[in-house]
Amino acid sequence: MKKLTIKDIDLSNKAVIMRVDFNVPIGKDGKVSDDTRITAALPTIKYAVEKKAKVILLSHLGRPKGSFDPKYSLKPIAEHLKNISGLNVIFVPHVVGEEVKEAVKNMKVGDVLLLENTRFHPGEEKNDQELAKAWAELADIHVNDAFGTAHRAHASNVGIANFIPSVAGFLMEKEIDFLNKVTYEPDHPYVVVLGGAKVSDKIGVITNLLNKADKLLIGGAMMFTFLKAQGLKVGSSLVENDKLDLAKQILEQAKEKKVEIVLPVDAIVAQKIEAGVEKKTADLKDGIDDGWMGLDIGPKTIKVFEEALKNAKTVVWNGPMGVFEIEDFAGGTKAVAEMIAKIKGTTVIGGGDSAAAVAKFGLESAYSHVSTGGGASLEFLEGKDLPGIRSIADKKK
């Protein structure tokens, strides 16, 4: 790890302003319904408290338009954090200003202050320097533990670093370490499994990882763009017709780079995307009938993928194999989740839908790393330089 981390600095009696990612779902009852991201930040928060720091937390929730919106308040998150951590969590219903300064002044060592949703301030997403400076003036050190927003240059994760030193929290450190390994230094054989709806969302990842991977397994709705590009009949399946040439180019590039692209050989098809409808298995070389659409990979494909993954030393998986939210079309995603879980090497699950899928199947702890950032992990795998990582101070050589 070339970046400074929270372990590299003395925190005793220091005020720490920490950017965490508490962008979690809130249920109809107004309570947190999935606290994965909150528990992921706990080790960093607790470490700072143990080291006798005063901890000020910053997070966004949802997409309020730069002004107060009660449904995006962090108040229920403060209550949840207090309940699960046993820490003295104090909620301040302001983002910045005199009330915040006063609350910080009254903090004792070991207190954890959670400020209101950073995106209630119009300056947050613009990386407004005045706002960043106001936050920086509350503390001695900035800790960035919000990998989920690493691909965004906002005031709370990037701006503050212009005024006080910024270091990585434990979650950020783990994300950087694992994603660095699979992007730049993978052990071989290296297999990349991609799914999800659109080729356009994954084009950067495919282009970058074709330089490193030995095999690329493609499932999800994006497979139909590749299959149609090869001249196969895909019925009413989702296809990006404007990306057919691109799919052909990718297949050509893979051939040149000697990367084996493994496409599905069968699919579970139905006439509607809903539970309980008639479904059947279609052999893809015979094509899918009009009016039917592919909604999951089929049983033969599962066997083909299992064979392709057999001796893998590194696996990255990003994107589900089908419409896994509906039980009828979750079989392929579940099978892939289970086969990757058995692999002895380094296994990394990209954030977003793939992370949601492995959580649904109760397999989160079976992998080397499940990323907490959907968009951020994709951009990292594309080889991009992320602003929320660049702004963290480097270790001295």
Swiss-Prot record:
Cellular component GO terms held in the UniProt record: cytosol
Positions annotated to bind substrate: 21-23, 37, 60-63, 119, 152
EC supergroup of this enzyme: transferase
Catalytic activity from the UniProt record: (2R)-3-phosphoglycerate + ATP = (2R)-3-phospho-glyceroyl phosphate + ADP
UniProt key word ATP-binding: yes
Subunit-level organization: Monomer.
Name of this chain's protein: Phosphoglycerate kinase
